[in-house]
Amino acid sequence: MSERNLNIEKERYIFRKAKAEDLPAIAEIYSKIHEEEKKGSLYVGWLPGVYPTADTAETALKRQDLFACEEEGNVLASAIINQCQVDVYEEGDWTYCGSEEEVMVLHTLAVNPNATRRGLGSAFVKFYEEYAIQKGCSVLRMDTNERNTIARKLYRKLGYLEAGIVPCEFNGIPEVNLVLLEKKL
């Protein structure tokens, strides 16, 4: 699946694998999220210069698991979608079990703060679910910071169950209470 067109709220979004030319826009999205968090208008729990960074996106691009959402040629959101479960997932109280081949994971979903309240987060998660189905995966997993109440509310609304909260250092960020989430397709 290289490209998927979805019409959401009369807006045309294109979900696709990211390209090298998308990296500056994705890094800018990360920077804008960090800026909004510094202002106190958003809480995701990420740290500038630590996670996520331009290197986060570049590494995912090299692995070919970085995805972008664009509208009229502008990248509005990105995410990493793969079958890599991070170490702390071992501590999850998972309801849905599956072999590594049956589990798809969503990481680092980032929506440009200037494009919020347009359904992009929901649309990206729906794209992730469709992508998982096409890849033969029936178990979905993801995580978020306990304090990221906006994401937690969205994921609950989309049918995801919380499978535990694990205190850890996550991607170089100390003292994170990581919420593990899951859904069965």
Regions found by a protein language model. Give the residues of each.
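Conserved acyl-donor/pantetheine-binding loop and adjacent beta-alpha core of acyl/acetyltransferases
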Residues: 80-108, 115-116, 169-173
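C-terminal "cap" of GNAT-fold acetyltransferases
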Residues: 98-100, 145-149, 156-158, 168-185
